[in-house]
Amino acid sequence: MATVKVIVATHKQYRMPMDEMYIPIQVGAQDRTPLGYVKDSDGENISAKNANYCELTGLYWAWKNLDADYLGMVHYRRHFTVERFGDKWNRILTMDQLELLIEQCDIILPTPRNYFIETTYSQYAHAHHAIDLDLTREVLMNNYPNYLDAFDSCMESTKGHKFNMFIMKRECLEDYCTWLFDVLFELEKRLDISAYSKNDARVFGFVSERLLDVWLEANHKGYREIPVMFMEKQNWIIKSWNFLMRKLKSRNFDR
């Protein structure tokens, strides 16, 4: 039987899944009051970068410090599911359900988000700073030119796998994290975020959401998609309004 460990990234106390494969981890723990969970500041870590890397400080910790056949990451308010009905907390993906999925493939992903009228690039540029992706492309051009075609293809796509949620065979996660953090650490050297808002300063977490599909496409990886549940109520009117406001107030960008 394969061993599986899935971290649940959180910055606050929250209800957690009961299945033993889940490990709640406090991200940004180096600069916060302990919550009683595993801390991303233990062992080899980049906890100090949490303000800019978001949940990736948890992913880095899992990559460097956990030993399992499969590793994954979800969020305290977002979980995988294969069930359509019933109480959300009773529908969170279990080890028994996951075992059936990983018999078919090595990577589990959330169903893709489709922006329909936006490309991945334009959506990011409307919400953040286009230069983040432009400099990411430069990093790839310099260090990983074999990824450029996949990057351009993903930037022009209207859909993608978001949320930084996945469960991968250890070998796949090793390859992905080695590449991802090498790209992000180089991007960090080149990108000036001194004038960014607190939200936009989370740039490396945002960029990484767009890089997962680049890695998948460049390496011709197969995967299985399953739904994601948001554990709280969402106000879709406000969410849609904010989306429209970002478009109307968007910064200029070329693409």
Regions found by a protein language model. Give the residues of each.
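ER/Golgi luminal nucleotide-sugar-dependent glycosyltransferases, focusing on the catalytic module
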Residues: 1-255
